[in-house]
């Protein structure tokens, strides 16, 4: 059996700018290593509803 698989968790990233404007939010799923990155992720990703790159924050 492989060791260390329990450190990687699946997270959801949600658009913050669309939420403020009241538009449809875009969501992305990705994985992160909770041992190396303990704080919440903030990434710039493409929002197809707004047709531009926006900030996406990790949600629970």
UniProtKB/Swiss-Prot annotation:
The cross-references to Pfam families, in alphabetical order and at most eight, read: Ribosomal_L33
Q: Which UniProt keywords apply?
A: Ribonucleoprotein, Ribosomal protein
Q: Does the keyword ATP-binding apply?
A: no
Mind telling me which SUPFAM superfamilies this protein's record contains?
Answer: Zn-binding ribosomal proteins
What InterPro entries is this protein classified in? Ribosomal_bL33, Ribosomal_bL33_sf, Ribosomal_zn-bd
* A GO MF label: structural constituent of ribosome
**What's a single GO BP term from this record?**
translation
Q: Which domain of life is it from?
A: Bacteria
Naming one, the record's GO cellular component terms include: ribonucleoprotein complex
The UniProt family comment states: Belongs to the bacterial ribosomal protein bL33 family.
Q: Which NCBIfam families match?
A: PRK00504.1, PRK00595.1, rpmG_bact
Protein name listed in UniProt: Large ribosomal subunit protein bL33
Q: Which organism is it from?
A: Pelodictyon phaeoclathratiforme (strain DSM 5477 / BU-1)
At the highest ranks, the source species' classification is: Bacteria, Pseudomonadati, Chlorobiota, Chlorobiia, Chlorobiales
This protein's encoding gene: rpmG
